[in-house]
Design a protein with these regions (language model features):
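A short, glycine/Asx- and small/polar-enriched loop/turn
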Residues: 40, 71-83, 125-132
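Helical element adjacent to the flavin cofactor pocket in flavoenzyme catalytic cores
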Residues: 86-145, 149, 154
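Glycine-rich beta-alpha-beta "Rossmann" dinucleotide-binding loop(s) and their flanking helix/strand
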Residues: 156-167
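Dinucleotide-binding Rossmann-like beta1-alpha1 core, especially the glycine-rich loop
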Residues: 1-73
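A short coil-to-beta-strand element that immediately follows conserved catalytic motifs
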Residues: 27-29, 116, 166-167
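Basic phosphate/pyrophosphate-binding loop/patch that engages nucleotide-derived ligands
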Residues: 50-54, 109, 163-165
Length: 167
């Protein structure tokens, strides 16, 4: 249930990202189809699709022929894992990851954020329950406010400041 709410909110954010950042992130909502290859996967995708529909998002459970109509170029006959069907999300899409990063960086710069590349955080100086300094491989940085944007190591860096992330 929580995943469908997260997905729904994410869709809305993606749909407004270029406007919010004033930057072309090459977002293209051409839809996404997650294929399933067993009855068990079909049942799981049916539950996911129903949760998405209950959340107000589009989701269509396709059988094999429905997939064949939308994806005629796939091999349906000589496959190791036969295609039983798919969950189609018409509003799903893609964006260029590098364009998203540049869009965020430019927006952050407009807000007065200094981004220091190739500079590893090694710890934080906590003063009165707040981060006062960021310790890095290039020395200490004093800061009135600190943002955390480190992708795959968010939990580890947050832990250096005594924070535990929910995801």
């Amino acid at each position: 249930h929580g995943n469908s709410q997260f997905y729904s909110h994410s869709l809305k954010l993606w749909e407004g990202m270029e406007q919010a950042l004033n930057y072309n992130v090459m977002h293209s909502q051409r839809g996404i189809i997650n294929l399933f290859h067993s009855d068990g996967q079909r049942d799981a995708y049916a539950r996911r699709g129903n949760a998405m529909i209950n959340q107000g998002d589009d989701a269509i459970l396709l059988d094999r022929e429905g997939c064949r109509k939308l994806l005629p170029y796939l091999d349906y006959e000589q496959t190791r894992f036969p295609i039983y069907g798919g969950l189609y999300q018409p509003r799903g899409g893609t964006a260029r990851h590098d364009a998203v990063a540049w869009g965020y960086a430019r927006a952050a710069d407009r807000l007065g954020v200094d981004i220091v590349e190739n500079c590893e955080v090694t710890g934080f100086g906590i003063e009165n329950g707040r981060v006062g300094t960021v310790e890095t491989t290039r020395g200490s940085i004093r800061a009135g406010k600190v943002g955390l944007a480190v992708a795959g190591r968010s939990s580890q860096v947050a832990a250096m400041a005594g924070l535990r992330l929910p995801i």
